[in-house]
């Protein structure tokens, strides 16, 4: 007789998940986009390594986040609370992505920026995973997953680039 409650529970879960899929929002012209053009720098070569080369180059967490589109736990990343001046580079290919002048405290536990660095190294793609539609943030040079961008950020852009620390390498002005 235990089968009936289990079957009922599975049916309820199926209805809930199915309803969420049917009620999802389709991307519109108002889907968030970077404040600057999301194109690779002129003359910048695309970086492409084998999966094994990425595993050899990156830590396990960096690999999981950047190559497998993972997410680190909130309030655990190296840079979520860093207030130093400098530039955040892609941990995979070292191009500049975000400036500390554009970083702000969003309360989310991840580094958050309201704008991207100049150079066109940050791009976006539609992410349809986990029964929702979000805008994924990627490195235009090596296609690394960086995080997601949302439309709940501060002025002047109204955007919140929510980025995984594991996808970043911070460089102070003296290290550039």
Report each predicted region and the residues it spans.
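Secretory/periplasmic and organellar redox-cofactor proteins
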Residues: 1-58, 149-176
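A short Gly-Trp-Pro
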Residues: 46, 55-61, 65-89, 95-176
């Amino acid at each position: 007789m235990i089968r009936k409650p289990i079957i009922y529970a599975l049916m309820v879960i199926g209805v809930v998940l199915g309803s969420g899929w049917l009620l999802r929002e389709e991307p519109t012209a108002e889907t968030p986009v970077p404040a600057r053009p999301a194109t690779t720098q002129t003359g910048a070569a695309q970086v492409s390594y084998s999966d094994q080369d990425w595993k050899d180059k990156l830590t396990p967490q960096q690999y999981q986040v950047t190559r497998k589109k993972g997410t680190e736990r909130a309030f655990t990343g190296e840079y979520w609370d860093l207030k130093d001046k400098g530039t955040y580079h892609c941990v995979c290919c070292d191009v500049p992505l975000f400036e500390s002048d554009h970083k702000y405290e969003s309360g989310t536990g991840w580094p958050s920026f309201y704008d991207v660095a100049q150079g066109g190294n940050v791009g976006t793609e539609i992410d349809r995973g986990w029964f929702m539609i979000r805008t994924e943030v990627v490195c235009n040079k090596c296609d690394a997953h960086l995080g997601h961008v949302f439309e709940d950020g501060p002025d002047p852009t109204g955007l919140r680039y929510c980025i995984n620390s594991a996808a970043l390498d911070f460089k102070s002005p003296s290290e550039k």
